[in-house]
């Protein structure tokens, strides 16, 4: 079955529910780190989508605003169905440093990866799977048969055991991380902040197959907002559990995660832990305020309060907040209001970002930024955590946690390592 939507034709057909879009990447001849494509996978997205062969490629360096660039690009896109349903849209990422175009921040940490702060593509083709339905979206007038033929060439992803890695380097180490926690607690006692999220970066050599690595991570740590980004010079594979912001019609929502126990510890203990509840409550208030900057007055509400979600190595406390977008606001206004996520900065957000810049020795780059897709009146963007960045023969994995007044430095260090454990395991490395 086919249908026209704006300037595109969407061809739908039934499938047996086992179609693997990641396996289609090599069949299409796409090379991670060379070709530009975006894969979104996980039940949180509502569909798995592969977007490729850019008609336009938006690359923004630090001297230009990625938010204005997005607004200009969206102005050229027709009102259409959601990009996750085959409509026109932009697929890509904002790095954490895109926040420098929202707030005046110091420049202290080393920008050693030197990646663009934002890249989005307007794809010529998208392929999507939802349940037992598959669709191929092509420009109006084009036939989908060439893409259909590629499915016949797709082979299942093979799970290869990684070669063991003897050395894992950390940007901070246990001593440095614990010193950072102690410094944050001093800022809290002085009344500067209530909570700060601090992170460390692990790196290991990696020359393996990137598609296989993605398959391994997806198997070890399945997640609702995962996927793969590929742009010239680097790739990123993600098992993110967290939604930054969604816009569907005029309904805006966010789903913050704050509060973590290692998997295997008592879930009720997590929900009753004063430190974890305090962390979550502060972030919940921050996210309500952020959403309120773009929502119509009086519409912001908590839809779900302090439930738990369990992943391969950790259990989190999660809530959901929603509101109606104000009449004078658009998707980019909403994204700017929510960015970067409060769960990965702390409260109050701007002062926390200043402290993060002071304490973390290297820039976060993609980590704690956001990737996903935007349409004319729709948006789904995650938070880039539980993600491996691959560049020039090195794999980078970052993890951290929220520090509050009664945080215990050694425990916070162990929590950050637990969050990185699934990533390091896929790389053949043992947590330090």
Task: Describe each region flagged by the PLM.
Residues 1-432:
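Extended alpha-helical targeting/anchoring segments
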